[in-house]
Amino acid sequence: MTANEFYASLSGKRITFVGVGRSNLPLIEQFKAHGAAVSVRDKRSEAALGEDGEALKKLGAKLICGEDYLESIDEDMLFRAPGVPYLLPELQKARANGVAVTSEMEVFFDLCPCKIYAVTGSDGKTTTTSVIAEMLKAAGKTVHLGGNIGRPLLPEIRDVKPEDVAVVELSSFQLISMRRSPNVAVITNLSPNHLDVHKNMDEYVNAKKNVLLHQNAFGRTVLNADNALTAACAADTRGMTYMFSRREKTNGAWCSADGKIYFGDEYIMEESDIRIPGKHNVENYLAAISAVWGDVSKEVIRTVAKEFNGVEHRMEFVRELDGVRWYNDSIATSPSRAMIGTLSLYDFKIVMIAGGADKKVPFDELGKVICDKVKTLVLLAPEKPLEGFKTPAAGKIEAAVRGAENYKDGAPVILHANNMKDAVRLARESAEPGDVVSLCPAATGFDMYKSFAVRGDIYREEVKALK
């Protein structure tokens, strides 16, 4: 089916969206314009939807809100938001009753006429996706960037040409239901994550593996040789597999002990050519190089490495005040991301603002690293978390620190705040000239904010307001 045929088929169809997001609006507007009757279902009350709810009503969508939002699903097609569990009993019942249960990204994959590069993993997805997109743009390609990053892609599907490329970031929530794989699949790494939603680690890993399981012999898979869970996925690949490594020579991109980056035997550039800091960003570049090798030149790879400034909320420099440098690493939504990001960068102890919603992942290793790397730990936990998020991660982080074998009483100093303004104030009072302060939550922000980006924006505003 072509994109035009898909949109023509919507006339007279009843379509429901489960889970409200501003990203739904362009698609709902298009569906309405093509004669579909659209409803939107969300567990939150209509009042809690705020501006999003008002915008949906203006488009003519019927709102079904509250605890019974999944009752009586009898539409022709259901679009599941990524945050809505695929295996909800109500969705399984809908499937059994003949409802087509799908998602924006699944339909995009079904209709996309061009080559698709897709990136998943526990950490490094957005930077790797962005670097791939930048390299392909620099090589002269028209790039459609989306998924978990950028804008929704399905609303622009009719503008996508066969000679273009699509570059998408995919989460486990999106992948769990997908039955098509991209032309180029990248798994950056795998570690415990989102275990508050997935029933166990096996389900999480199996969801991630969907990015490669449906490839054919002409596909390409890129895997991290330094991460055991990721490297093991090589047993399930069907096309060409490239491994990347920061520790040893591989058939893909790898970095030598003296800081030179190669693809197989071919020299590309120096590790120091990469503008954005951190060993984890070297890994992100190795993954990106392995994904685009043969599609872009070495010159393009080097140029992007030297010029790309990175992505917002990823160890983003905010300002320097009174000799103290402030960074925003709000994207560090897991212990592993915190450890390979902010906590890997400095050979001196920093001031760290952490905390958020508990994803039911272990914090033991993070506790040890905090004891080694942090002088003051400011733990952020709201007095009243947002609906549905009862357990802040702050308590588990503190327990992991105090229970670490290398913890000494008072080192690190542990402080508590229930809002970002107070967290920034406490961090400033603790920091001395020459120090670094970083928002490095090691947890999602959903107990207080709509997203990690909103959390990072508020942190940035508070830091910039300091006098």
Give names to the regions the model predicted:
Residues 70-75, 82-225, 229-240, 429, ...:
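Phosphate-binding loop of NTP-binding sites
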Residues 53-61, 364-435:
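C-terminal helical cap/extension that packs against the catalytic core
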Residues 37-44, 221-225, 351-354, 373-383, ...:
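Short internal beta-strands
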Residues 31, 78, 101, 119, ...:
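Residue-level signal for inorganic ion chemistry
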Residues 1-103, 107:
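N-terminal leader/targeting and accessory segments in enzymes
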Residues 178-181, 211-217, 235-237, 344-346, ...:
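Short, conserved loop/helix-junction motifs that constitute active-site signature segments
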Residues 3-14, 24-34, 142, 271-376:
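Nucleotide phosphate-binding/pyrophosphate-handling subdomain across enzymes
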Residues 42-43, 64-67, 102-106, 238-256, ...:
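Beta-strand->loop->alpha-helix junctions that form or flank phosphate-binding loops
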